[in-house]
Amino acid sequence: MTRAGRRLAVAAGLALAAFIAGFVVFAVAVARLAPAGSVRADGIVVLTGGEHRLSVAAALLSDKRGKRLLISGANPIATRHDLFQRSGLSADLFKCCVDVGYDAHDTSGNASETKAWASANHFSRLIIVTSSYHMPRSLTEFGRAMPEVSLVPYPVLPRRSQNWWADAIKARVIFSEYVKFLPSAVRFAAARLTGLDEGAVAGGNEMRASTVRGAR
């Protein structure tokens, strides 16, 4: 093997080792995430998905941890009544204080949808509710879209989150999320270094507040 070939092999090996080490750090970190006990904010945002996210966010609203709740990225076939039944909230509280966004199809879309909602309601501090493994990428996308808004993570923990290495399905989910998180983190860092936020980068694609359906 030539000297250049050896250098390339060493560089590739170091890159692979760094990638694997990064995954282990990421997996351990998300397994240790825990929701804050007495968190409060202007609004609450839940990113639709499994792990009882909606019921957790609804409990925060019921406990008056925020003024309004946005359900971001709701399935188009899910009606407000469907979401109401799943939330466990009273009819009056759901009617007055829950908004439903149907336009987000990924985490970046969640960030855009939330930015429009927060702006329309003049909110500067938000509680973000999503699964623990999805939280790092959510915070980077939301932070890039709304650098002026304070984000409070409220992770929903999966069962046996500490034993992710013993569950092939869970480990695969965390690995997939890690792979998605890396480019998101790079975009976040680049936006910070260049002084650009999501609105400046993709202002023409920003979702309007009117796309979020509320009771008002």
What are these regions, as identified by a protein language model?
Residues 2-35:
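N-terminal type II signal-anchor transmembrane helix
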Residues 2-6, 124, 212-215:
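Short, intrinsically disordered low-complexity segments
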Residues 16, 20-23, 130, 175-178:
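Generic intrinsically disordered, low-complexity segments enriched for polar/acidic and small residues
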Residues 18, 22-25, 93, 122, ...:
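Intrinsic disorder/low-structure terminal segments
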Residues 28-168, 175:
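A structural signal for short, hydrophobic/glycine-enriched beta-strand patches
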Residues 89-96, 173-180, 197-204:
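A general structural signal for short secondary-structure boundary/capping elements
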Residues 167-197:
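A transmembrane-helix-recognition feature enriched in membrane-embedded lipid enzymes
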Residues 191-216:
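Short linear elements at protein peripheries
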